[in-house]
């Protein structure tokens, strides 16, 4: 059950009186959503100034933008069908608490940021109560069989799509959708500053650098961490001149990776707090868990190896749901495999080490990926924060709320 100490209420909304200060409520469920939402907050603040406050569930980056997180984001940072069962009671209690708070004090608008399983269940009753609802980040309805789109139709007034092929899918279902590009494409430089990133992280000079990102959730790091470290050890034996950099998204994750590092003291490893962008910018190649980080690596124009491991039952459910043949965003956006994916039983230390070194040493492939990912970057760079803010403000204005 959610602790009483975190059952705060959100600041009251403004109703229809534009002269009063109002609240836009937002919920982000993990580190990637926190990053995306923080960038969106910048666009909203530019449009609305200080007439509106922002509250709900968010992380450190959102709070840096003035967001008030009434519940801990870590409650929602659980992934996978089996893994979520241990936290299900707390997750559902949190959703009931924020739902009741928002219905008692209606915000100007509710913005769900990714976390579709949590947010759609929250958005349906909020929209039914007349609260404008925008969902930022389309779920993978193009990867799953299409039953999910019926839930989306009940849940949202508008959906903001990160990728150019998505709005057409929603148009066929009669759901308002706008392609806004990806905010990371606006903030990641078109030309990476590799030397600057290495200097900032104080990485060893004269070494080729492998960035290692086993995930931003504890479940991910526990599933992949040992395998990744064993792969790093094999790479070190094959090329002792390699340096590794691993960004830990939180203090608990840092503790896990530091414990793993003790088993492989020979590794030339730099563990950094967060700062995944700089770690990838500094790298020659990236070994990482499937997720938003794969797109970040592509925007930094890096060769990479994508991996993922989930419990057997979770994997079987995912297979039955009809996933695409690839899970990494660079491959999905390309419509083909441009970087290797090693999943489940294929994600052995031997295979990960071999594929990562192949990616590191294939100069022709490195040149191809740099050009290919540059074109992808140009497509996704759309001034997302402004476009997304425009949709939200226009929706509120159509209801006479601002």
Curated annotation (Swiss-Prot):
Signal peptide: none
Family indicated by similarity: Belongs to the LpxB family.
Keywords per UniProt: Glycosyltransferase, Lipid A biosynthesis, Lipid biosynthesis, Lipid metabolism, Transferase
Catalytic activity: a lipid X + a UDP-2-N,3-O-bis[(3R)-3-hydroxyacyl]-alpha-D-glucosamine = a lipid A disaccharide + UDP + H(+)
A cellular-component GO term for this protein: membrane
Task performed by this protein: Condensation of UDP-2,3-diacylglucosamine and 2,3-diacylglucosamine-1-phosphate to form lipid A disaccharide, a precursor of lipid A, a phosphorylated glycolipid that anchors the lipopolysaccharide to the outer membrane of the cell.
Organism listed in the record: Cupriavidus pinatubonensis (strain JMP 134 / LMG 1197) (Cupriavidus necator (strain JMP 134))
Enzyme Commission number(s) from the entry: 2.4.1.182
Gene (UniProt): lpxB
PANTHER family: LIPID-A-DISACCHARIDE SYNTHASE, LIPID-A-DISACCHARIDE SYNTHASE, MITOCHONDRIAL-RELATED
Gene Ontology BP terms: lipid A biosynthetic process
Protein name, per record: Lipid-A-disaccharide synthase
């Amino acid at each position: 059950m959610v602790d009483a100490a975190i059952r705060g209420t959100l600041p009251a909304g403004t109703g229809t009186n534009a002269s009063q200060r109002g609240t836009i409520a937002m919920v982000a469920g993990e580190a990637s959503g926190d990053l995306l939402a923080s960038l969106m907050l910048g666009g909203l603040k530019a449009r609305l100034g200080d007439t509106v406050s922002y509250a709900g569930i968010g992380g450190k980056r959102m709070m840096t933008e003035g967001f008030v997180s009434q519940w801990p984001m870590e409650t929602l940072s659980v992934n996978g069908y089996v893994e979520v069962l241990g936290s299900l009671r707390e997750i559902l209690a949190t959703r009931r608490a924020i739902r009741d708070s928002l219905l008692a004090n209606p915000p100007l608008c509710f913005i769900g940021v990714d976390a579709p399983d949590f947010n759609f269940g929250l958005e349906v009753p909020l929209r039914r109560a007349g609260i404008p609802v925008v969902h930022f980040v389309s779920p993978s309805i193009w990867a799953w069989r299409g039953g999910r789109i019926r839930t989306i139709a009940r849940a949202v007034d508008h959906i903001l799509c990160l990728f150019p092929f998505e709005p057409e899918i929603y148009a066929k279902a009669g759901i308002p959708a706008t392609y806004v590009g990806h905010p990371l494409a606006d903030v990641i430089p078109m030309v990476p500053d590799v030397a600057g990133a290495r200097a900032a992280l104080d990485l060893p000079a004269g070494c080729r650098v492998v960035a290692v990102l086993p995930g931003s959730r504890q479940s991910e790091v526990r599933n992949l961490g040992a395998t990744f470290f064993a792969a790093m050890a094999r790479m070190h034996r094959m090329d002792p001149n390699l340096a590794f950099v691993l960004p830990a998204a939180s203090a608990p994750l840092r503790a896990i990776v530091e414990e793993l590092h003790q088993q492989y003291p020979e590794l030339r490893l730099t563990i950094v707090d967060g700062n995944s962008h700089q770690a990838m910018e500094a790298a020659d190649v990236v070994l990482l868990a499937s997720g938003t980080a794969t797109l970040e690596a592509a925007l930094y124009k890096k060769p990479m190896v994508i991996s993922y491991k989930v419990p057997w039952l979770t994997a079987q459910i995912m297979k039955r749901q009809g996933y695409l043949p690839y899970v990494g965003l660079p491959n999905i956006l390309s419509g083909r495999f441009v970087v290797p994916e090693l999943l489940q039983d294929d994600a052995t230390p031997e295979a990960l080490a071999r594929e990562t070194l192949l990616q590191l040493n294939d100069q022709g492939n490195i040149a191809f990926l740099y050009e290919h990912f540059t074109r992808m970057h140009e497509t996704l760079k759309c001034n997302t924060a402004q476009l997304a803010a425009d949709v939200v403000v226009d929706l509120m204005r159509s209801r006479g709320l601002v």
